[in-house]
Curated annotation (Swiss-Prot):
It is an enzyme of class 6 (ligase). The active site is at residues 86, 181, 183. This is GMP synthase [glutamine-hydrolyzing]. Homodimer. Its EC number is 6.3.5.2. NCBIfam families: guaA_Cterm, guaA_Nterm, PRK00074.1. Pfam families: GATase (PF00117), GMP_synt_C (PF00958), NAD_synthase (PF02540). Catalyzes the synthesis of GMP from XMP. GO terms for cellular component: cytosol. It comes from the Bacteria.
Length: 525
């Protein structure tokens, strides 16, 4: 057994920055376990967590307001290093006797910081050197307020032209404040700064690796489940697939997976899932072919939200029916990941593992009394993918573009019919195939085809045809909260259009969606 991968840990207190989860992901990349909590935690909770260091995140509030968030006083009395980032630096300064004011000159975007005094956090870290020999850092700023006076026992380490206290430090207490964001890639030395803080100043060892996570998770699953049986809804998506393989490694044939083919999957997806998990990995899988049942339930329904609810309810019904056939099952496994936990955690309650209802299978009969198994609940999506690779899942499967839970149910506009799904599957497969051939698939964040329930006249040979329209959609995004439409080459789009119209009998016109998010959403429904 490897060393306890949770022994060394960093606590990140969240003040609401859009980059806070990125801080946690960077710390994990360094190889150290960390957790992300709301800023208003209690002293008791911090003591119980026993971190090696604490990071105060940025945030949208102003420390000049009376009711703005503050770090718990215990943070500065815990005897561990503290790093304040942006708002975190400002509240650190304010709480320890410094001063913060609303700045007349806001800094958003690229800036250059000049390091004037040496300190352990920035020793030998620089991007360039000024004319008078001072180290310079290329950083990313995003702040309106600024520190105008640092606490008495702090030293000014660096400044910019408009920010006199860009970095401050109390080396004796190991307290550091930076006005910029080291967690974003625009701060070129950001990862080096975080490594220095976590590994050197906090004294953490890099124990958090994919191989160690697998070993630790399997051991904990064995301990939690014992000799019991587990049921899992396997979709073929990243989270449920990695969950299945971790459980398979821990308990083998005592895991039963239920794979429901709802008729709303991608071309040949059901066959691929069965070949992968039943064939290659020899998992115990119940394959439920339920296309007719789903399409019957959806017949005549045009409203997108009602379609989603019908699909979800029908899935739960089928899963329940299969689950009650397995009286030996004592546990329900889910692919809940850490961002789900973060979103669900109630502020200052300590209930960090309350899961949102839409992530649960839900609807199971109460008398089943199944325990919940969530092997991925500490992991970010990128960590889940790396573990999947380690477990033997193919790269192309793990790094596929996102596919919505309701599947083609939200990509066939209006009423869902088998004819529409079959046409859409074939058209979408051509689009994705051509993206791969042109080496464009990994250059866009998400690409798919939408079936439009309108007919358009077309000409084939000497005849006219009156067939359906599909829209191609491809976007580029970092976080899926906003997105730009992908500027795919015209000749590529022409090639895809020609193939779809010539090879998919029933489609006469192909259009390309050039809407950004906002105002449009990425999916059409």
């Amino acid at each position: 057994m490897t060393a306890n991968i949770h022994n060394h840990r960093i606590l990140i207190l969240d003040f609401g920055s859009q980059y806070t989860q990125l801080i946690a992901r960077r710390i994990r990349e360094i190889g150290v376990y960390c957790e992300l909590w709301a800023w208003d935690v209690t002293e008791e909770q911090i003591r119980e967590f026993n971190p090696n260091g604490i990071i105060l995140s940025g945030g949208p509030e102003s420390t000049t307001e009376d009711n703005s968030p503050r770090a718990p006083e215990y943070v500065f009395n815990a005897g561990v290093p503290v790093l304040g980032i942006c708002y975190g630096m400002q509240t650190m300064s304010m709480q320890l006797g410094g001063d913060v004011e609303v700045s007349g000159e806001r800094e958003f975007g690229y800036s250059q910081v000049e390091i004037r005094e040496t300190c352990e956090l920035f020793r030998d870290i620089q991007d360039s050197v000024s004319e008078d020999g001072k180290p310079l850092l290329d950083v990313w700023m995003s702040h309106g307020d600024k520190v105008t006076a640092i606490p008495a026992d702090f030293v000014t380490i660096a400044s910019t032209e408009t920010c006199p206290f860009a970095i401050m430090a109390n080396e004796e207490k190991r307290f550091y404040g930076v006005q910029f964001h080291p967690e974003v890639t625009h701060t070129h030395q950001g990862l080096a700064i975080l490594k220095r803080f976590v590994l050197d100043i906090c004294g953490c060892d890099a124990l958090w690796t994919s191989a160690a996570i697998i070993e630790d998770t399997v051991a904990r699953l064995k301990q939690q489940i014992g000799d019991d049986h587990v049921i899992l809804a396997l979709s073929g998506g990243v989270d449920s697939s990695v969950t299945a393989l971790l459980l398979n490694r821990a308990i083998g044939k005592r895991l039963t997976c239920v794979f429901v083919d709802n008729g709303l999957l991608r071309l040949n997806e059901a066959e691929q899932v069965m070949a992968m998990f039943k064939g290659k990995f020899d998992l115990n899988i119940i394959h439920v072919e339920a296309e007719d049942r789903f399409l019957t339930a959806l017949k005549g329904e045009n409203d997108p939200e009602k379609k989603r609810k019908i699909i979800g309810h029908t899935f739960i019904e089928i899963f329940d029916e299969e689950a009650v056939k397995l009286p030996q099952v004592k546990w329900l496994a889910q692919g809940t990941i850490y961002p789900d936990v973060i979103e669900s955690a109630a502020s200052a309650t300590g209930k960090a593992h309350v899961i949102k209802s839409h992530h649960n299978v839900g609807g199971l009969p109460e008398d089943m009394k199944l325990g919940l198994v969530e092997p991925l609940k500490e992991l970010f999506k990128d960590e889940v993918r790396k573990i999947g690779l380690e477990l033997g899942l193919p790269y192309d499967m793990l790094y596929r573009h996102p596919f919505p839970g309701p599947g083609l149910g939200v990509r066939v506009l209006g009423e869902i019919k088998k004819e529409y799904c079959d046409l859409l599957r074939r058209a979408d497969a051509i689009f994705i195939e051509e993206l791969h051939k042109a080496d464009l698939y990994n250059k866009v964040s998400q690409a798919f085809t939408v079936f439009l329930p309108v007919r358009s006249v077309g000409v084939m040979g000497d005849g006219r045809k009156y067939d359906w329209v599909v829209s191609l959609r491809a976007v580029e995004t970092v976080d899926f909260m906003t997105a730009h439409w992908a500027h795919l080459p015209y000749d590529f789009l022409g090639r895809v259009s020609n193939r779809i119209i010539n090879e998919v009998n029933g489609i006469s016109r192909v259009v390309y969606d050039i809407s950004g998010k906002p105002p449009a959403t990425i999916e059409w429904e």
